[in-house]
Design a protein with these regions (language model features):
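Extracellular glycan-recognition surfaces and repeat-rich motifs
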Residues: 41-77, 264-302, 306
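Bacterial N-terminal signal peptides
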Residues: 9-22
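N-terminal secretory signal peptides that target proteins for export/translocation
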Residues: 1-8
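Short tryptophan-centered beta-strand motifs in secreted/extracellular beta-sheet-rich domains
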Residues: 34, 102-104, 176-195, 202-204, ...
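Extracellular carbohydrate-recognition regions
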Residues: 25-54, 244-281, 476
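Short, aromatic/His-centered strand-loop micro-motif at the edge of beta-sheets
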Residues: 155-186, 384-409
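Flexible glycan-contacting loops in extracellular carbohydrate-active proteins
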Residues: 214-244, 433-463
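Secretory/extracellular carbohydrate-interaction modules
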Residues: 69-163, 299-387
């Protein structure tokens, strides 16, 4: 069973230098710059669906006659994909300090399972799920029926929102979903910066019922910027939806759809074989230089999935009785919500023989960095460990690593005498202690590398370079 605890405090990255030098001098560490492909173990890290499914986008302006009798609408077939697609009006930059309002009507005539469309304000650089710099409502298809959500994302991936149903979760609500039968629904989406005590208030109205959503104070301070208004696909793997929008207004002004409005079209009329889809991992060695700036690194797309996957190198058998150290560079390029990955030491047999989800049976024999966190925050860069019997701890919090593609330095240090684990990201570090009881239970490790969380979820896209790590116990 995993528990959560720990502390976070700022720290100067230069202070890890004595530790680095000490480990280097005793010969217990190994260095990899990945300039050539290493002979690491790849276990289910490169999976390919056969045949490759086809992603199809076919949406935009349509010279059709909606039920109101006025010609022109936007919409069509929109499919979930990690590849972004949108049809949107370019607008002057707006922020969370501006009033926003839009309204219209929509109808869904078909939806396959796991489909999704976002409608509202976003930015041309908005990527991923959940979507930063966005203030939208979402149509979420579930195979002939769909749910409606309203949500926002700030510039640093803070999110908030809710659903148009009773309770907190659509999986347990007594509210019935909408049917994809072409029924027309009316909607209004507004944002008032002075609402909710000055934190900002988002209000979504669907068929006359209002759903207010106050922004968290921290989210308002983080801010967001929008320069597009329109429709875009939900950027996660899945299927498609046929949906149509008409009688649109923006800032209380009607949008003329009687003729082609010439809105910006990106990836909205295309077909391609889909390589990036759950749960088909694609990580290992890469000739790219995203993390270290020079060709050669490891990483790629790693999914949360109930089945095991890893890319790692063998090390001499290590335990909680040995001092452990690792450091390197990391670049985080993309992620969905409910996603994560481990980087550190683990036991190959414990990992590859485990076929149950982590919430039924925790992973055993690991000491690692866990890049993961709640969707309201994003991704913490924090320590985690588990003993040979599966008892362990995940830190409550840690430095937040944003999926913005920037390169960062990091380190992980475990002291066997005190049980202290220190994780550092740039100039911020976190510490926690392996309890005496857990140290007595013990853990063994014979691999170092990347390995997945075995629980259903979404993906992370990372790159690791200039890697130093303990490969044998000191003094051997």
């Amino acid at each position: 069973m995993f528990h959560r605890r720990g502390a976070v405090r700022p720290f100067l990255s230069a202070l890890c230098l004595p530790t680095c030098l000490a480990f280097a001098q005793d010969g217990s560490v190994r260095f990899e710059d990945f300039s050539v492909e290493p002979s690491w173990l790849s276990y289910r890290s490169h999976l390919l669906p056969n045949p490759l499914p086809i992603t199809r986008q076919s949406f935009g302006w349509r010279d059709t006659l909606p039920t109101n009798g006025s010609r022109g609408e936007i919409g069509g077939w929109i499919q979930r994909s990690l590849t972004p697609a949108w049809y949107a009006k370019v607008i002057p930059a707006r922020t969370l300090n501006d009033k926003l309002s839009a309204s219209g009507k929509f109808s869904v005539t078909r939806d396959d399972s796991t489909s999704g469309v976002l409608v509202g304000w976003f930015h041309e650089t908005s990527r991923g799920w959940r979507t930063p710099n966005s203030l939208v409502f979402r149509l979420d298809g579930n195979g002939g029926k769909y749910w409606v959500f309203y949500e926002y994302g700030t510039r640093h991936w803070f999110t908030g929102g809710g659903g148009c149903f009773e309770g907190d979760r659509y999986q347990t609500t007594p509210t019935q979903p909408f049917k994809a039968d072409g029924t027309t629904h009316e909607w209004t989406l507004t944002y008032e910066p002075s609402g909710a005590g000055g934190n900002g208030l988002m209000t979504f109205i669907l068929d006359g019922k209002a759903y207010p959503q106050a922004l968290a104070a921290e989210h308002r301070r983080d801010g967001a910027e929008f320069n597009r208004f329109g429709i875009c696909n939900l950027q996660a793997t899945g299927s498609g939806m046929e949906v149509h929008f008409h009688e649109l207004t923006l800032d209380s002004q009607p949008l003329d759809l009687s003729r082609d409005p010439g809105w910006e079209a990106r990836g909205n009329n295309t077909e391609f074989p889909e390589r990036q889809m759950r749960p088909f991992h694609d990580f290992g060695w890469r000739p790219t230089g995203k993390a270290g700036g020079k060709p050669g690194e490891i990483g790629g797309i790693i999914w949360r999935d109930e089945k095991p996957a890893c890319y790692a190198t063998g090390v001499e058998t290590l335990s909680l009785g040995a001092n452990l150290f690792a450091s390197g560079k990391i670049a985080f390029h993309g992620a969905g919500s409910d996603s994560g990955v481990y980087l550190g030491w683990f036991d190959a047999a414990s990992k590859t023989n485990k076929t149950t989800a982590d919430y039924h049976e925790p992973q055993r024999n690991l000491l690692a960095i866990l890049l993961e966190g709640p969707s309201r925050v994003g991704h913490y860069f924090r320590a985690a460990y588990s003993t040979r019997v599966g008892h362990g701890v995940i830190q409550d919090s840690g430095p937040i690593l944003y999926p913005d593609g920037r390169s960062h330095t990091w380190s992980l240090h475990y002291k066997s005498t005190s049980g202290e684990i220190t994780v550092q990201l740039d100039e911020e570090r976190t510490t926690m202690v392996v309890s005496p009881e857990h140290r007595q239970e013990g853990a063994t490790f014979d691999r170092f590398g990347l390995f997945n969380l075995q629980a259903g979820g979404h993906f992370v896209d990372i790159a690791i370079d200039d890697l130093t790590f303990t490969a044998r116990a000191a003094g051997k």
